[in-house]
């Protein structure tokens, strides 16, 4: 179920303050965040945000095609390494 259009998109206040501070200084700096549920808004375009995936922070460069998506969509949490090999030969 999607968020109601009457409400604004969710962005963590701390993350929003960091973005606004960097926009006023016109500096580019990596922003570290744990807020995977935050929605990407147009003021974030051009910044690099390091998103936590449960183990480490993955730096993601925000471009205009990412607006409207959540930050967590770009930092996968699971690492699929393939199915286990069947060891039928060892049983014979």
UniProtKB/Swiss-Prot annotation:
- Tell me the protein's name: Small ribosomal subunit protein uS19c
Q: Which domain of life is it from?
A: Eukaryota
| Gene Ontology molecular functions | rRNA binding; structural constituent of ribosome
User: Which terms does the UniProt entry file under GO BP?
Assistant: ribosomal small subunit assembly; translation
State its role: Protein S19 forms a complex with S13 that binds strongly to the 16S ribosomal RNA.
Q: List the InterPro entries hit by this protein, alphabetically.
A: Ribosomal_uS19 (IPR002222), Ribosomal_uS19_bac-type (IPR005732), Ribosomal_uS19_CS (IPR020934), Ribosomal_uS19_SF (IPR023575)
Where's it found, cell-wise? Answer: Plastid, Chloroplast
| One Gene Ontology CC term in the entry | chloroplast
Predominant location category = plastid
SUPFAM superfamilies named among the record's database cross-references: Ribosomal protein S19 (SSF54570)
- Gene3D superfamilies linked: 30s Ribosomal Protein S19, Chain A
Q: Which UniProt keywords apply?
A: Chloroplast, Plastid, Ribonucleoprotein, Ribosomal protein, RNA-binding, rRNA-binding
Protein's UniProt keywords contain Chloroplast: yes
Recorded family membership: Belongs to the universal ribosomal protein uS19 family.
């Amino acid at each position: 179920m999607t968020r109601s259009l009457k409400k604004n998109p969710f962005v963590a206040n701390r993350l929003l303050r960091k973005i606004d501070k960097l926009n006023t200084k016109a500096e580019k700096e990596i922003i570290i965040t744990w807020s995977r549920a935050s929605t990407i808004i147009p003021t974030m375009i051009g910044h690099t945000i390091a998103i936590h995936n449960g183990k480490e922070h993955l730096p993601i460069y925000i471009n205009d095609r990412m607006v409207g998506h959540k930050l967590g969509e770009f930092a996968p949490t699971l690492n699929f390494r393939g199915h286990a090999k069947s060891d039928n030969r060892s049983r014979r």
